[in-house]
């Protein structure tokens, strides 16, 4: 009881959420550093731009429209007309400022090539992509039908991203995350019971299982030899 410790209040806070992709059950959630200090739950309330983490949903839409992992796409400079993005003239770049020329769709995702993601979106159409991402639970209001959608310029919450990626993880079914399994009184009688959407039972199949499988395999390569190789330090083989 005589021990002392120093606690430093963070200037920047993060969030964490874990969801069972087969029924939407929220296994764990951390909304911030200290709930007593700040009631703002970053998992459910923090709307942020997802950036490149949104690209797999655009790639998935591309697969649905006829692209394959071996499709050749040009990673080359591009000038976008203002009307296509709802703003000013746009000359998108890759993160490193370099261009790789013709490459496969698989290679482009592994290296997170912005120009390839944009060209995929141009080929399938922004209206179609906006409709398609709704299959993962994303709303059209937060993701305007502009080419900037290819780079994750919309708005999502961490819980929304977990919900979206669950579709890939469970083989193509959409499940709605839930917090409470059931409510019981002091005698153990169930007053309320959640009826979750369960994969293989009542969950809606929103994308082709083959699409989900291919996307998962492509995302695994991002860890094996792409922009997320640091994740290999965890020593796991199931990460994507």
Explain the meaning of each model-derived region.
Residues 17-18, 27-29, 71-74, 107, ...:
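Structural recognition of the beta-strand scaffold that forms the well-ordered cores
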Residues 23-25, 33-37, 49, 78-81, ...:
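Solvent-exposed loop/turn segments at secondary-structure junctions
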Residues 121-124, 131-136, 143-146, 176-181, ...:
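Short coil/turn segments at secondary-structure boundaries
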Residues 22, 67-129, 174, 186-214, ...:
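Conserved catalytic neighborhood of penicillin-recognizing serine enzymes
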Residues 87-94, 125-163:
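Mid-domain, small-residue-enriched loop/turn segments at the edges of structured enzyme/sensor domains
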Residues 23-24, 44-75, 108, 164-168, ...:
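Active-site SXXK
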Residues 1-18, 29, 36-40, 107, ...:
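A penicillin-recognizing enzyme superfamily signal
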Residues 1-48, 52-56, 70-71, 127-134, ...:
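Periplasmic/cell-envelope proteins involved in peptidoglycan metabolism and beta-lactam response
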